[in-house]
Amino acid sequence: INKVEKLERGYRIYHGDSCYEGKECVISAGRSGSKWMEQVCRDLNIHTNSNRVDIGVRVELPAGIFSHLTDELYESKIVYRTSKYEDLVRTFCMNPKGEVVNENTNGIVTVNGHSYEDPAKQTNNTNFALLVAKHFSEPFKDSNGYGESIARLSNMLGGGVIVQRFGDLIRGRRSTPE
């Protein structure tokens, strides 16, 4: 989409050489389109106040460990409040018998999870995101930029996505390929 224009009774959307009009307009830009979406909102005088970002890791473990949950409810939502800072930690995007895949968004490599109905594509692992929401107060306004900078620094430190074994994490050391 090149431009979104507010009309007296609806919207006009410009996409390449085409133009579309409608009484209502729903735009879903996703995380990679968040900067563009912020600009669209500014152009249309739409107030935004997204001053939160989810920071986390993707956890992969043998499927049997969570099978008591995933056999009953495909995508379990687990929430935990930490005792020290009272942060809410939550699971998101659970993929029973799924795989972890790399994604490149604007030059930043992150991971996501997929799972498949086809048994031939299923793995022996389950994966999910473990997230903490970070809320910012004024005057800071660029929560998406904050999250992006953490991902970019992680890529710099690890030469790509950082992979960490749980045992090494507990011992306070980096995991090695061996």
Predicted regions and their residues:
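Residues forming the flavin
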Residues: I1-E178
